[in-house]
Swiss-Prot record:
UniProt-recorded name of the protein: Large ribosomal subunit protein bL32m
UniProt keyword annotations, A-Z: Mitochondrion, Ribonucleoprotein, Ribosomal protein
Keyword check for Ribonucleoprotein: yes
Entry's family note: Belongs to the bacterial ribosomal protein bL32 family.
One GO term (biological process): translation
Predominant location: mitochondrion
Alphabetized Pfam families for the sequence: Ribosomal_L32p
Entry-linked InterPro entries: Ribosomal_bL32 (IPR002677), Ribosomal_bL32_bact (IPR044957), Ribosomal_zn-bd (IPR011332)
NCBIfam families (alphabetical): rpmF_bact
Compartment(s) where it occurs, according to its Swiss-Prot or TrEMBL record: Mitochondrion
Length: 62
C-alpha cells in the first residue's frame, strides 16, 4: 500500500479541498424542488413523484 513520504502542508490541503467542495456544489445545483409536490427532482426533467413538467401533466402516476 502506498504511503506518503511527507505530511501535506495546510495550504495544499486547503487547495485540494476547495476543488472537491466546488465539485460537490456543482452537483447539488443540478436539482430543484417540484412546484406541485415539493419533491426533489433534477432540473429540466419530469418529476418522478407527480409526473408534472413545467405546469403540465406529462404522465399520470397510479
Amino acid at each position: 500500500m502506498a504511503v506518503p513520504k511527507r505530511k501535506p502542508s495546510v495550504s495544499r490541503r486547503k487547495i485540494r479541498n476547495v476543488f472537491i467542495r466546488a465539485e460537490m456544489k456543482k452537483n447539488l445545483s443540478n436539482y430543484s424542488i417540484c412546484k406541485h409536490c415539493n419533491y426533489v427532482k433534477k432540473k429540466h426533467h419530469i418529476c418522478n413523484n407527480c409526473g408534472y413538467y413545467k405546469e403540465s401533466l406529462i404522465y399520470k402516476i397510479v
